[in-house]
Amino acid sequence: KAEAALRARRTSSLAFEGPADEAPAISKEFEYTPRHRLVLAGRGAIFRSMAQIGRATGYDVFALSPELSDLDAVRPVLNAEPVHLMSPNSSMPLDMLDAHSAFLTLFHDHDWEPALLRAALDTPARFIGSLGSRRTHEMRKETLRQMKVPEASISRLRGPIGLVPSLRDASSIAVSALAEIIAEFRN
């Protein structure tokens, strides 16, 4: 039962109990949680840094990008074949997202985000966030409203991602975003 739950990426527990005729009976329960997943959609230096830092932190990393050079750069740290995005408007199921997953959009050109965010918001992903300013985030949410995404789903979207605002270098932004994700998974 526990093994099947882990294969299905569900939290499971195992209990061990001593014989009932012994005093005192010894029992111990262990809870096992699937490894966290970090699913990244983006391009550029922040995308690359986030993949590397996510993997170094122990996350299973998945990547989607319109840039083949970015996918090639992060391929060594991925846990699955990267997905080459062909069009900003193409919808795709994000089947790899579950309750133990975080999904981030890491684009400076935000045209790629709406279809991806709509798909992500239809999943049980624990954390969904996007790069950008507060103004960009408000525009992003308005775009999702125009796409008829329910307000309850839109409220799940985090942005701008990161615990430290207004960072400029890719590695610092990645660390700041990952810290926010870690904090969410610890709650």
Language model feature labels by segment:
Residues K1-H84, D98-S101, E180-F185:
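Segments forming oxygen-rich coordination pockets for charged ligands
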Residues G44-A45, H110-D111, R135:
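Residue-level detector of alpha-helix initiation sites
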Residues A51-I53, R75-P76, A115-R118, K141-T143:
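Short amphipathic alpha-helical segments
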Residues Y59, A125, V149:
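Short phosphate-binding/catalytic loops that engage adenosine nucleotides
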Residues D72-P76, L94-D95, E138-K141:
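Short, charged, surface-exposed secondary-structure boundary motifs
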Residues P88-A99:
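Short amphipathic alpha-helix with an adjacent loop that forms part of the alpha/beta core around
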Residues A102-F103, F107-H108, R118-T143:
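ADP-ribose/adenylate-binding Rossmann-like module
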Residues L131-N187:
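Adenosine-phosphate binding glycine-rich loop
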